[in-house]
């Protein structure tokens, strides 16, 4: 198996040939949603894809797949036992102007998280700075209300002496502008290109240096670029020759 390679062709034919069993730490992919008339935007047979994903992913590896409705529902329903939850990418700029008279403009896109057979996944949360009003001083005692509808333990509890009042665990909202920098109209390399910062955030959240990432519909190669920047290995695949060549050039530069 060769790593840090980009393959041209149908991923359902390439994965069995080039990816070994239980070799991948993270599958990170922007699958075709089937919502446009573009030649490349045809939904891959999900039953065949899941068979390969479950073969190559490690037992505690993560499968991250971009989606938006109605494809999100189709995707989750195709393997509900492996589905964990969704992150929500806030693109800042709205879309869907053609149907603005009939429904709200769309600003969110889903990042669906799956595991192998529902297993626990490796998770390395990128901590966030807490707002001043939400900070709790170290080593201070707090009182929980007795009426606790969420089933949490009531009574007194004490913050840890090692508690860092400046940091909080991440929320599931990911705010990354989809029309600035490399994604503006002049620089964009692919119609559904994702922000490199977003890709790198998710890579940091679920992998460590030296881990292997698979992107079987890589488009312009942003996943591979993020992996390279963060000292991870990658295997990428792309069926469209034009975008395959773009991805190869980005990774060579």
Walk through the language-model features, giving the residues of each.
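Core catalytic lobe of class I
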Residues: 1-236, 242-246
């Amino acid at each position: 198996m060769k790593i840090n390679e980009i393959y041209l062709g149908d991923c359902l034919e390439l994965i069995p040939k080039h990816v070994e069993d239980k070799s991948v730490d993270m599958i990170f992919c922007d699958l075709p949603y089937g919502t446009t008339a573009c030649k490349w935007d045809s939904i891959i047979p999900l039953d065949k894809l899941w068979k390969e994903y479950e073969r190559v992913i490690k037992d505690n590896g993560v499968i991250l797949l971009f989606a938006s409705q109605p494809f999100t529902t189709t995707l989750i329903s195709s393997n509900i036992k492996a589905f964990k939850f969704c992150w929500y990418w806030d693109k800042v700029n709205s879309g869907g102007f053609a149907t603005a008279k009939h429904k709200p403009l769309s600003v969110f896109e889903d990042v669906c998280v799956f595991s192998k057979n529902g297993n626990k996944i490796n998770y390395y949360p990128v901590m966030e700075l807490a707002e001043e009003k939400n900070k709790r001083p170290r080593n201070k005692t707090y009182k929980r209300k007795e009426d606790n509808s969420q089933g949490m333990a009531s009574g007194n509890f004490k913050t840890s002496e090692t508690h860092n009042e400046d940091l909080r665990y991440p929320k599931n909202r990911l705010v990354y502008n989809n029309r600035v920098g490399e994604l503006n109209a002049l620089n964009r390399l692919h119609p559904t290109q994702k922000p490199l910062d977003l890709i790198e955030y998710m890579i940091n959240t679920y992998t460590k240096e030296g881990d292997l990432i698979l992107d079987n519909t890589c488009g312009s190669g942003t996943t591979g670029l993020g992996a390279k920047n963060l000292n991870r290995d990658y295997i990428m695949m792309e069926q469209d020759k034009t975008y395959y060549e773009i991805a190869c050039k980005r990774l060579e530069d």
